[in-house]
Amino acid sequence: MLLRLILKSGLLAVIAFSESVTFRFDEAPINNIVYSSSFWLSSSAAIDPSRENRFIFQVGYCTIFNQQNNNYWSYPNVDMGLKITKNLSVTTKAYGFSIQEEAPQVLGAGIQYYFGTNNDTLDWSACIQRVDLKGLEHFRISSITFDIRKWISLRSTRLRIGVGSNFFKENSYLMGDNIPTKIEGQINFLGLDITMPLSIFILGIEARMNADRVLTTIFLQKEIF
C-alpha cells in the first residue's frame, strides 16, 4: 500500500508541477538546456531479468527538476527491449515529437547484461547505452550512459537500485559571443526504480538523482511475448 501511494503521489507531482521543456538557447541558460537534455537521454528500459517475456514496450513521462533554477521540465520517453538470451537484452529508442518550433528526434540503442551469484539468480544488471538527440535548430547531442543496478524483490514490487554515469558531447548550430561551439560533460547519478503489476501492464516510477538535477519518470510497460 505504501509503495502504491508513492507511485500515485509521484504521478500527481509530475503532472502538477512540470512544464514543457525548451530546446532553444534564446529561451533559457544554455548549460541548463544541454545538461538536462543529456540527463533525459540517460533513461533506459527497466527490463526485469526474473521475468520470462522476451519483448517489452515502455512509454513514460519524464520530469527533470533543475535545482539551480528551481524549474521543472518535462519530456516523453519511449523504449523497446528484446531479450536475446537469459543474460542479455538489447534496447532501442527511436521516436520524435513536436514542441513549439522544434521537432526533436531521439535515436539510440544499448545492451543490458544480467548476472548474479549463479545463473539462476540474476539479480544484477549492467547497462551501456548510446543515444543521440537530433532535429533541433540550435544544437545536437551524442551521449553514452553506463550504469549498474541491483534488483530486489519486495512482495509484488520490484526495486532496481544503483549508480551510473552519463557522458555527452554537444555541438551548437547557433553562433554568438556567449554560445560555445561545443559542450562536453559528465553526469553522475544514483538511480532507483520501483515497478509493480497493474492488470496486464507493469507500472513504474524511476528516479535519478544528481547534485544539480533530479529526474523522475512515470512509465507503463507492456510485455508482448
Task: Indicate residue ranges for each PLM-predicted region.
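Outer-membrane beta-barrel transmembrane domain signature
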Residues: 19-56, 60-63, 68-71, 136-202, ...
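Outer-membrane beta-barrel domain signature
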Residues: 76-77, 82, 94-96, 101-102, ...
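Sec-dependent signal peptide recognition
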Residues: 2-12
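Sec/Tat signal peptide C-region and signal peptidase I cleavage site
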Residues: 14-18
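Membrane-embedded beta-strand positions in outer-membrane beta-barrel channels/transporters
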Residues: 77-79, 108-110, 145-147, 189-193, ...
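Disordered, low-complexity tails and leader-like regions
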Residues: 2, 122, 200-201, 213
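Glycine- and aromatic-enriched membrane insertion/assembly motifs of diderm outer-membrane
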Residues: 62-122, 129-130
